[in-house]
Amino acid sequence: MSFASETKKELTNLEVKDCCAKAELSALIRMNGSLSFSNRHLVLDVQTENAAIARRIYTLLKKQYDVSVELLVRKKMRLKKNNVYIVRFSENAKLILEELKILGENFVFERNISEELVAKRCCKRSYMRGAFLAGGSVNNPETSSYHLEIFSLYKEHNDSLCALLNEFHLNSKTLERKKGYITYLKEAEKITEFLNVIGAHNSLLRFEDVRIVRDMRNSVNRLVNCETANLNKTIGASLRQVENIKYIDERIGLEALPEKLREIAQLRIDYQEVTLKELGEMVASGKISKSGINHRLRKLDEIAEQLRTGQSITLK
């Protein structure tokens, strides 16, 4: 089961107050519902591919309105051939839609979230939970990027949902997609805050555990890469220095060098793998700083270059 599916399953088991149940139902029906007429009666179908969400809708409807509700199961004939669950009812459908602030006067569909419906902070949380159950998805925290989004068919609803999330300082943003709109979060901290707001506390803990391990692993990898790069740089410089020193020895002999340069040249030949700092600590005449060692090695590089190009040699 995916992380998003586990999160939704957890949410469908939450107990809610009556006012919050209506807010959650409003989001679920508004985003997943469709209306039709049968025998001159208004019929409402709420469709989902998630069995737990279908049971949630069924239970909330029965608890809040005690109406006759059907639960149908169909199988998709294309692509994944998943089951499709349809929660269907016609009894008092218009009145329920009006109470849930989905239908207004004269059978007008309300595309914005009703302020009255989410007047209480607990109801705001519940509407957000219903919206996530209806159209939400969240990446597994083990994947390459953090991303949570909620899909809406209508721009007005998407904008009001984004504003609702931002009442909780979630820094959510909106984006138009091919067949609708999304409200999304990209920051890991904001995703965990959202999970907390909608009541997915177990999923929040799992998300944080995985994120901490992942971030720690990334930090270790960056450190290792940095150390590897520095090591490669050190090895590359050492090989160049040794090559130049050997060239000097072949052309004029190390004995021709001033004592200070000869001493460093011999140490570098003998200890090719050590750093400049370590090399400075090996000088018999006394410890030399890293910059001092670097200066002498650069001087040896210059002498080797002068020999290669036939220039006059400066040994001092």
Curated annotation (Swiss-Prot):
Pfam families in the cross-refs: HTH_WhiA (PF02650), LAGLIDADG_WhiA (PF14527), WhiA_N (PF10298)
Domain of life: Bacteria
Biological process according to GO: cell division; regulation of sporulation
Gene Ontology MF, one: DNA binding
InterPro entries: Homing_endonucl (IPR027434), Sporu_reg_WhiA_N_dom (IPR018478), Sporulation_regulator_WhiA (IPR003802), Sporulation_regulator_WhiA_C (IPR023054), WhiA_LAGLIDADG_dom (IPR039518)
DNA-binding region of this protein: 275-309
SUPFAM superfamilies membership: Homing endonucleases (SSF55608)
Protein keywords: Cell cycle, Cell division, DNA-binding
PANTHER family, sorted: CELL DIVISION PROTEIN WHIA-RELATED
Function per UniProt: Involved in cell division and chromosome segregation.
HAMAP family xrefs: HTH_type_WhiA
Family statement drawn from the similarity comment of this UniProt entry: Belongs to the WhiA family.
Entry protein name: Probable cell division protein WhiA
Gene coding for it: whiA
